[in-house]
Design a protein with these regions (language model features):
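ASCE RecA-like P-loop NTPase motor cores
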Residues: 1-599, 638
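Acidic, low-complexity intrinsically disordered tails
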Residues: 1-2, 439, 575-650, 655-663
Length: 663
């Protein structure tokens, strides 16, 4: 099947020429192209049409889960009949194992897995290996972290057909080899069960389960059914079952990996003994032998990713396999909000290296654990085929890659203009802001306010609430799905003002927002440079009455550049509208998400603690306990993000104690 855009709109404004130039560039073999598209100009729609023109499997790379979720929802609407997949980190919370040499404390890995996101990741790899060409994957930078070898993954794909001669025992053996677990009670994704001559399989990546009827050693019938109601949905002549886990491997490879691990273990233990580190030698021997026993029995162990180099058959120091290895060689990469995403990819590799070095140095892991890592930037570049960078404010890197040439998309299909920018003094800025908010509320419009610090955002939210303004503030500790919910509540009018620090910039699609207020706009720095100001002001560009107020006592270079560029674009847009007799039209965009249909279930790994709880919590109501757990969870996630592993571990233990008290 080919990519086919489904939309009630046709390309307008600058979109037709942008689509034509970018598509022609891909066909002509241009390796790098840049789309400079202003906020609200329909860059996603342009990209969708380019994909339709070139018919290439496509990876759309976003710099965070919120933006990835929004792009996924939009592309699902544009391509309802094609394979649109979502690939982000499946951890709601992740604390890696770590050793603190100063205190001698080792902290075990702890995590909270989002089962729905895990299913979507497996759906992505399964679709990519299915051979279909009409596949578009929206991914965060987590797609550059190591996953299983695509060759091994493909080897463990099970293909069956009606009337095929195959023993039931052989099929069951293949399912176990593909890491499906047999069950009799809970029929969950990644399991199979046997009922007489029938085998039922619930793939890890699918919404429905499959029932395979045998007559002797022949498959009589294959059908899909609803796992909850057992109602038959569809019958098949053929069926492909993909592995239940990305780290699947064949018995031969597993045996070879076990032998290599044993050899490296002997070498590392001997090395530790030679330099007098007997404790480290004993520790490494015990931990690795325990893991090896698990691998022999089950085919995997906790922390098996630390042995991925052996399972992948890679040499020391070579890069891990990642999602990009699953794409065909002619795939197209689209880097959204490239001025942020590219720099994020740059910083990934160095993030966990020192932590891994400690684990190896003190005998918690073999040196091969160092090769379980994200891609280095040069490795990321080497895997690219053709790239389109998309941004309203492309950075020097993208412009250099595309030889300083970019495709401009300034005229919006709706005829909407860039926001009017006003600079006002910071004296009495809050009173002035409240007056502006009241005007917008009367018109049923929304307001975004951006501050310099989280504390300022909190204090402002408290004050505005006190004077009767319905507001919320958003910050980095709010998890992905809650963030999406907050954005939807703002659009629905459940509250009128959203306050934030650095989260109200790239890619947020909020047509109801007519005013963006930037406090302390003259404080030069990362949050108030030219690109940040342009992106933040752009949040009001999707509204007919779009306006931005910069509260400042002096005119900085960044402010002046932003104002000049905005005025240039605004003049060009007005002239185009006048020449073509266009009246700007408000955007009427549906308020929905591809995620609202699937409630997400959280699964936690951990052990039960028998330590007594803090005395005061024993008298708390269920509501208060749940509130305290939520607060501690946010603090734990923050500590883990800041690599304060000891604090994160303490908070994790506190949460487990509190959860035991819930009625």
């Amino acid at each position: 099947m080919n990519f086919q855009v489904s939309s009630e709109y046709s390309p307008k404004g600058d979109q037709p020429q942008a689509i034509q130039k970018l598509a022609q560039g891909v066909v002509d073999g241009e390796k790098y192209q840049t789309l400079l598209g202003v906020t609200g100009s329909g860059k996603t729609f342009t990209v969708a049409n380019v994909i339709q023109e070139v018919q290439r499997p496509t990876l759309v790379l976003a710099h965070n889960k919120t933006l990835a979720a929004q792009l996924y929802s939009e592309f699902k609407q544009f391509f309802p009949n094609n394979a649109v997949e979502y690939f982000v980190s499946y951890y709601d919370y992740y604390q890696p194992e770590a050793f603190m040499p100063v205190t001698g404390v080792f902290i075990e890995k702890d995590l909270s897995i989002n089962e729905e996101l895990e299913k979507m990741r497996l759906s992505t790899t399964s679709s990519l290996l299915s051979g279909r060409r009409d596949i578009l994957v929206v991914a965060s930078v987590s797609c550059l972290y190591g996953i299983g070898n695509p060759v091994e993954f493909k080897k463990n794909v099970i293909e069956i057909a009606r009337d095929q001669v195959i023993s039931r025992t052989k099929l069951l053996h293949s399912l176990v080899q593909s890491l499906y677990a047999r069950t009799e009670a809970d029929f969950n994704p990644g399991t199979f069960r046997i009922k007489g001559d029938t085998v039922e399989v619930y793939p890890s990546y699918a919404d429905d389960a499959y029932r395979i009827h045998f007559f002797g050693d022949e498959i009589e019938e294959i059908e899909a059914f609803d796992a909850k109601t057992s109602q038959v949905i569809e019958k098949f002549k053929r069926l492909t079952i993909y592995p239940a886990n990305m780290f699947v491997t064949s018995p031969e490879v597993l045996q070879g990996a076990i032998w290599e691990i044993q050899q490296d273990l002997v070498k590392q233990v001997d090395y530790f003994k030679e330099i007098g580190k007997h404790l480290e030698a004993k520790r490494l021997e015990e931990r690795t032998n325990f893991d090896l026993e698990m691998i022999r029995e089950l085919g995997y162990c906790s922390g098996i990713e630390n042995y991925s180099r052996y399972l992948d058959g890679r040499q020391a120091g070579t890069r891990p396999f990642c999602l990009l290895d699953y794409f065909p060689s002619d795939f197209l990469m689209v880097v959204d909000e490239s001025h942020v995403t590219v720099s994020q990819v740059h910083a990934m590799y160095g993030g966990d290296r020192s932590r891994k070095e400690n684990l190896v140095e003190y005998g918690f892991r073999l040196p091969a654990a160092m090769d379980n890592r994200p891609l280095k930037f040069e490795e990321f570049e080497a895997l690219q085929n053709q790239v389109i960078y998309v941004s309203a404010t492309p950075a020097d890197y993208e412009l250099q890659k595309s030889d300083g040439i970019y495709v401009e998309q300034i005229i919006r299909p709706t005829g909407l203009l860039d926001p009017i920018i006003e600079v006002r003094p910071s004296l009495n800025q809050i009173d002035d802001l409240i007056e502006e908010i009241q005007v917008r509320c009367e018109l049923d419009e929304r307001v975004l306010v951006t501050t310099l610090t989280k504390r300022m955002a909190e204090e402002l939210a408290k004050y505005l609430t006190k004077v009767g303004v319905r507001c919320r503030y958003i910050h980095s500790e709010v998890d992905t799905l809650e963030r999406i919910e907050i954005m939807q509540d703002l659009r629905k009018g459940i509250f009128d003002v959203l306050i934030g620090v650095n989260l109200l910039r790239e890619g947020l699609d909020l047509p109801e927002v007519s005013l963006v207020a930037i406090l302390d706009a003259d404080k030069e720095g990362f949050l108030r440079n030219h690109r940040s100001l342009t992106q933040t002001i752009g949040r009001a560009a999707r509204n007919l009455n779009g306006k931005a107020i910069l509260y400042a006592d002096k005119m900085t270079g960044s402010m002046q550049k932003t104002i000049d560029e905005t005025n240039y674009r605004r003049t060009k847009q007005i002239n185009f509208n006048t020449e073509n007799n266009i009246t700007p039209q408000a955007l009427n965009k549906k308020i929905d998400s591809a995620f609202t249909k699937n409630p997400l279930v959280e699964y936690e790994l951990g052990h039960t603690l028998s330590v007594a709880a803090e005395p005061e919590t024993a008298y708390m109501s269920k509501t208060d306990l749940e509130k305290l757990i939520r607060e501690k969870r946010k603090s734990m996630e923050k500590a883990a993000k800041e690599l304060d592993f000891m604090q994160a571990a303490k908070l994790r233990d506190d949460i487990k104690k509190l959860q035991e008290q819930l009625p």
